[in-house]
Each structure stands twice: as structure tokens, then as C-alpha cells.
Regions:
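Short, acidic, metal-binding catalytic loop of nucleotide-sugar glycosyltransferases
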Residues: 2-15
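Short, aromatic/basic amphipathic alpha-helical patches
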Residues: 5, 30-40, 116-121, 177-183
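Hydrophobic targeting segments
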Residues: 17-19
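Active-site-proximal specificity loops/subdomain of glycosyltransferases
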Residues: 22-93
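Short, flexible loop/turn elements at secondary-structure junctions
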Residues: 23-25, 102-108, 135, 151
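Catalytic core and acceptor-binding pocket of nucleotide-sugar-dependent glycosyltransferases
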Residues: 73-76, 84, 91, 95, ...
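GT-A fold catalytic core of metal-dependent nucleotide-sugar glycosyltransferases
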Residues: 80-130
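Terminal low-complexity segments of carbohydrate-biosynthetic enzymes
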Residues: 241-242
Length: 242
């Protein structure tokens, strides 16, 4: 959805936006993608075999295979982490300066709230991450987030965390995994005021693994949901006080 990127550029005229992407070596219409999004730096990846990791996933939430697919979560985070390493390489070798890093999927649209984005980014501090104000059901949605360059480098050990997460038979849900990782890293979660997104996709499939949420994960998910509600309330309160 190129319109979302165009909207971002319009609302952030004071930012020099550089598109850096890591894509699969067998990616369809790669040249079209590069031209459409004006990709400045591109990193070609080989797809990894995650079969061994996937076989160890014991529990999932009911959204599995419809809202998310287990193999795709591994592929997604592999590409995100490789892109982070690529950013670091560009910074070290080409002296490219990245003040902030925005991760976003190309199948999202903004429903409202873009007007608050610039001020939220400008007030972003170390160890803080900005998320949209909606689409958080079991933790934190991973389709869009912003942090500064030094903070994103701390994500490089994500798979070490995920390996322990799976060994501990935690429930596998991408939102809950991201929330748990950020909690373990002691990063501060911030919601962009009234910044609502929507995903352009429709799927309807049954889960492939056991749908079950261990008690400790239920508690943490409820805590995450209440935390999101509190952050939304705090944003509204700030607007009233202004």
C-alpha cells in the first residue's frame, strides 16, 4: 500500500526518510518493489529452514493459521533482524546516519491520527518504542513501530529470547511474544495518540497446533491489555490538559 508511505512523507516533511529493505532472493517483482517504494538500500536474504523450531511450538492462540502462521513469524523476525544488522553495517561502513527506525508492513493503512506522529517521534527517548493506538489484542502488534537507532540494535538477540520462550512452553502468539520481549528488555511502551491502523487482508483457517493459553500467560496477556488501555487513557488525558 504505497499510499500509506506517501501519507507518512507528507506528514513528516522535516524528516529525511530513507527506505532500507531486506528481501528474499526469490522475491517476485523485486525491481517493481524497489522503484515503487524508492528503496535506497536493499539486502538480499536466503530463506532459512525453521522446521526444527516450529516443531517445538506447543501451544497457540485461536488466531493461529488465520491471523498469523507460525512459520511466517520466524521468517518475519529473521528479515527484521537481518535488516537491523544491515542498518548497522550501513552506519559503520557507509556512515549512514539513522536517528529513528520505523518498521512497517506494506499491507497497512492509516485510519486516523497521523497529525500526532511528528511530535511523538520528536519526543522519543532512548529505550522507548512507539506503537499505533489500536490492533493490540494479545500484546503488542508488530505491523508498525518506531524507535531510535541505538534502541533497535538491542533487538539483535531476539531469537535467543524466542528460543527460551519456546523451550518454556509459552503460548505462541506474535503480539504476546513481542510484548514479552519488550518487557524483558525493560523498554518503555508508548502509544501514538489516536493513531489507528488497519490491515488489508482476510483469512479464515483453523489452527494447526493445540489452542491453549497457560495460566501465567493468561495473566500476562490480561496485564498487557490493561496496560494498553491505561496508555490510551493517558494520551486522552494529555490532550484534555493541553
Amino acid at each position: 500500500n504505497i499510499n500509506f508511505l506517501k501519507d507518512l512523507k507528507k506528514i513528516l516533511p522535516n524528516f529525511d526518510i530513507t527506505i532500507v529493505s531486506s528481501v528474499w532472493e526469490n522475491q517476485d517483482e523485486l525491481e517493481n518493489f524497489k522503484e515503487k517504494y524508492n528503496v535506497k538500500f536493499i539486502n538480499i536474504l536466503k530463506e532459512k529452514d525453521w522446521t526444527n523450531y516450529i516443531s517445538k511450538v506447543k501451544y497457540v492462540t485461536w488466531e493461529e493459521n488465520s491471523g498469523f502462521k507460525v512459520p511466517n513469524i520466524f521468517h518475519m523476525w529473521h528479515s527484521i533482524l537481518e535488516n537491523i544488522k544491515f542498518l548497522e553495517k550501513l552506519n559503520n561502513e557507509k556512515k549512514e546516519i539513522f536517528d529513528f527506525v520505523l518498521r512497517f508492513r506494506t499491507d497497512i493503512i492509516c485510519k486516523k491520527g497521523l497529525k500526532f506522529l511528528e511530535s511523538e517521534i520528536n519526543s522519543l527517548k532512548d529505550n522507548e518504542i512507539l506503537f499505533p493506538s489500536n490492533l493490540h489484542w494479545k500484546g503488542l502488534n508488530d505491523s508498525f513501530f518506531i524507535t531510535n537507532f541505538s534502541t533497535i540494535l538491542g533487538f539483535k538477540d531476539f531469537f535467543t529470547f524466542l528460543d527460551e520462550f519456546i523451550k518454556d512452553n509459552r503460548v505462541f502468539n506474535p503480539e504476546y511474544i513481542l510484548y514479552s520481549f519488550i518487557s524483558e528488555k525493560n523498554l518503555k511502551i508508548r502509544l501514538i495518540n489516536e493513531f489507528d491502523l488497519a490491515l488489508i487482508r482476510v483469512e479464515d483457517s483453523k489452527p494447526t497446533k493445540t489452542v491453549f493459553i497457560p495460566f501465567k500467560d493468561k495473566i500476562k496477556m490480561k496485564f498487557a491489555k490493561q496496560k494498553i488501555k491505561l496508555l490510551k487513557f493517558q494520551n486522552k488525558l494529555k490532550q484534555v490538559i493541553k
